[in-house]
């Protein structure tokens, strides 16, 4: 299970990096849309890193555990909203349900502890 926990965390980081770099090909000029696209990628990277640190150090302090739970709930909420918005085009956007599933997995790992 520990391996799967680490894998899910680093997959979130990887998807966040891909999302951030894709922004450069989708948006050719600075815009509000580009900023939101970029910030979503940064959010995924941060959530993945929080989970990677938590997975590496165990349950940790109460504040750190709360931070991981909050980050995972935020990933799940954004994933749900994105799946609702892209419901007709999920086959072209497989990263949307992937991020949601990874958020749920990491939340379960966080709540389970060691």
Residue spans of the language-model regions?
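N-terminal membrane topogenic signal
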Residues: 1-11
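Non-cytosolic membrane-interface motifs at loop->transmembrane helix junctions
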Residues: 29-38, 89-99
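Core segments of alpha-helical transmembrane spans in multipass integral membrane proteins
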Residues: 10-21, 33-56, 69-77
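Alpha-helical transmembrane segments and their membrane-interface exit regions
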Residues: 42-47, 98-110
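Membrane-helix boundary connector in multi-pass membrane proteins
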Residues: 59-60, 66, 70, 76-96, ...
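Short juxtamembrane and helix-loop transition motifs at transmembrane-helix boundaries
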Residues: 26-33, 51-64, 79-85
């Amino acid at each position: 299970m520990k391996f799967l926990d680490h894998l899910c965390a680093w997959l979130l980081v990887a998807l966040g990096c891909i999302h951030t770099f894709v922004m450069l090909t989708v948006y050719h000029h600075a815009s509000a849309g580009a900023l939101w696209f970029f910030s979503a990628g940064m959010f995924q990277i941060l959530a993945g890193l929080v989970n990677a640190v938590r997975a590496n150090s165990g349950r940790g302090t109460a504040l750190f555990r709360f931070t991981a739970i909050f980050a995972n709930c935020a990933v799940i909420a954004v994933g749900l909203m994105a799946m609702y918005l892209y419901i007709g085009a999920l086959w072209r956007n497989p990263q949307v349900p992937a991020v949601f599933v990874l958020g749920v997995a990491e939340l379960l790992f966080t709540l389970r502890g060691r």
